[in-house]
Amino acid sequence: MGPVMLDVEGFELDAEEREILAHPLVGGLILFTRNYHDPEQLRELVRQIRSSARNHLVIAVDQEGGRVQRFREGFTRLPAAQSFAALLGMDAGGKLAEEAGWLMACEMIAMDIDISFAPVLDVGHLSAAIGERSFHEEPENVLAMAKRFITGMQSAGMKATGKHFPGHGAVSADSHKETPRDPRPAAEIRRHDMLPFRELISYNMLDAVMPAHVVYSDVDPLPASGSPYWLKQVLRKELGFDGVIFSDDLSMEGAAILGSYAERGQAALDAGCDMILVCNNRKGAVSVLDNLSPIKAERVTRLYHKGVITRQELMASARWKQVSGELTALHERWQTHKAGQ
């Protein structure tokens, strides 16, 4: 299994993409909205990807809910994480969050997609990049809601990825556009932002972690996604995490501080990442594949989905019909709530 996760351009593979997917360093593929037209087309694209790849790839998507849901038409419209507690309270919201985790995972597994990069464990709604993607402004409540969501995901056969370690919730800048800096004392980050990660790791509920492209300037001059301190010292040694560490997308401006594409990829692997994401830049991806030394990402093979349900079976089930309706209603309530603020 190779350590590089790539993307593809459209609704079906072109000849160059088939060739790239056969490269031994490619171990994963992430899908975006541009890859989706309808469920049948998506299923065929996944089949093409599987048949073209040398390795048994981990196929991923960001299907969190709210504003980050890559596949919408033909799938349940998932509400933003914040809406569960904000509109339903912790108890009823937690119950529906667990059902949301189950339904999201089932809908993706029916497409033969292994993981959705979820849930978001960032605390609070200040950050432009996070906002409603966070379950709550209190770390204990983020933890409680995330536990329910992950329980649902895992019951469907999907592994959970917590993001963005050690916490992106307190910085207003968007790491897709620049390198955010969080100047808060290390003790505050550890006590506040890291709590959901720390506790979920102790419960053995996180299968993977995605670090933040944020510089925590009181701690380390490198963004967490390229920092041996955060990934090896804190995440691996202090917290005892033995799951998969993903880099966030090395094409984001927040990663530019790490150098060229090949340098960014090597830096992320050297820092402790198991798998690096290189998206939205074909030349950058090819550069990484051409320049990385051969390496195996053995932990990543743990992330294959374990589900066997078909789309037809899922949508015929009473549970899916009930939960899909409840989630759609909450999504619509949340849109109305936001419009009235």
Curated annotation (Swiss-Prot):
InterPro entries: Beta_hexosaminidase_bac, Glyco_hydro_3_AS, Glyco_hydro_3_N, Glyco_hydro_3_N_sf, Glycoside_hydrolase_SF, NagZ_Beta-hexosaminidase. One of its GO terms (molecular function) is beta-N-acetylhexosaminidase activity. Substrate binds at D62, R70, R133, K163, H164. The active site is at H176, D248. Its main location: cytoplasm. The record marks D174 as: Important for catalytic activity. It comes from the Bacteria. Its EC number is 3.2.1.52. Keywords: Cell cycle, Cell division, Cell shape, Cell wall biogenesis/degradation, Cytoplasm, Glycosidase, Hydrolase, Peptidoglycan synthesis. Signal peptide: none annotated. GO terms for biological process: carbohydrate metabolic process; cell division; cell wall organization; peptidoglycan biosynthetic process; peptidoglycan turnover; regulation of cell shape. The keyword Signal does not apply. Pathway: Cell wall biogenesis; peptidoglycan recycling. It catalyses: Hydrolysis of terminal non-reducing N-acetyl-D-hexosamine residues in N-acetyl-beta-D-hexosaminides. Pfam families: Glyco_hydro_3. One of its GO terms (cellular component) is cytoplasm. It is found in: Cytoplasm. Belongs to the glycosyl hydrolase 3 family. NagZ subfamily. Plays a role in peptidoglycan recycling by cleaving the terminal beta-1,4-linked N-acetylglucosamine (GlcNAc) from peptide-linked peptidoglycan fragments, giving rise to free GlcNAc, anhydro-N-acetylmuramic acid and anhydro-N-acetylmuramic acid-linked peptides. This is Beta-hexosaminidase.
